[in-house]
Amino acid sequence: MSTVLVIKAHPRTANVANSVVIGERFVEAYQRAHPEDQIIVHDLYEEGVPEINSSNLDSWTKLTNGTTYQELSENEQILLSRQQKLQEQFIHADKYVFVSPMYNLFIPNRLKMYLDLVIVSTKTWVEGEHGPEGTLHDKKALHIQSSGGTYHHTDNEFMAKLDLGDSYLK
């Protein structure tokens, strides 16, 4: 059994958003083909994403400097527990499906916030001999994205290079 984490990063619903329609159809077809797999849908606009701010950074610094989790304030513990839950969910998933529109040639800000939160040194990457090295091996990812133009499957190399969000997720 695999765990599939669907990260929906679109503020609109399926009745007006092509990527959401395609994402929902993909999940339905996947579930029919793999009924034993667990599918977890995380809607970044419905459920929100904890923002990285001075409070989180202060809490992370305290932990790095030797403060125990129990010594943190109740508010700091609540904040970090939400972040840790999202990180663990991401780390333990076997497959990822990112569903998003292309905004300004990139990904929506909530998806970037989410990735900043879950891609963490020592958990998802380490500093290797030749630079950063990922630690989440043998995982698969799919990016379902709609855009207002054609950026792939074109002879125009310039247009293909403008899809920064897809390249970023790779």
Question: What residue spans do the PLM features occupy?
Answer:
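N-terminal beta1-alpha1-beta2 submodule of the flavodoxin-like/Rossmannoid cofactor-binding fold
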Residues: 1-100, 105-109, 113-116, 120
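FMN-binding flavodoxin-like domain, especially the glycine-rich phosphate-binding loop
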Residues: 33, 79-88, 109-170
